[in-house]
Amino acid sequence: MIKFIRTLGFKKPSNPILGMVLAGEVDSVGKDVKSFKNGDQVYAINIRQFGAYAEYTCWPESVIAKKPSDVSYEEASSFRYGGLIAWYYLKKGNIQSEQNILIYGASGAVGTSAVQLARYYGAKITGVCSTANLEFVRSLGAELVIDYTKEEATKSGEYYDFALDAVGKRKNSNNWSRQDK
């Protein structure tokens, strides 16, 4: 017996194809697309539509960007994810010039974007990362960098106007922020 859900079609798959972040090559474009052509190397994030893990997918022009030629597909696929998450939380935190902020996990995809965006906003940045990434995080714009393998960021006695945990391992980051005092 065949069970029809709708008169004019079949039921959607119960497990849609996953993925909101992609990097690849444009195979074809619609007649109204202005920014891309066949063969363009691109990367994208689409928080409203899954399907990035499919071999082919169709996404709106507004969520796609051209991939720089000196960047791999793997690197490009991480650009928008880290940047979007960092931007969202810094915007939500209403970061202002001269504020003192802490970025825990400053060397990952979200953290590196957060350091650069916070620098753009004019904030004073303390980054927390491992020994291997201290100079890298400093080069992104952090004024102070704490090596979490040697020092606990919460023990410094410093208060921050905003703290971003880009790792997700802190049980309680409220003790870092004036917003919670």
Identify the function of each model-found stretch.
Residues 3-48:
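Glycine-rich beta-strand-centered segment in the early N-terminal region that forms part
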Residues 37, 62, 96, 140, ...:
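Structured loop/turn residues at beta-strand edges in well-structured enzyme cores
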Residues 35, 111, 134, 153, ...:
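Short, well-ordered alpha-helical microsegments
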Residues 77-150:
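Mid-domain Rossmann-like dinucleotide-binding core that forms the NAD(H)/NADP(H) cofactor-binding site
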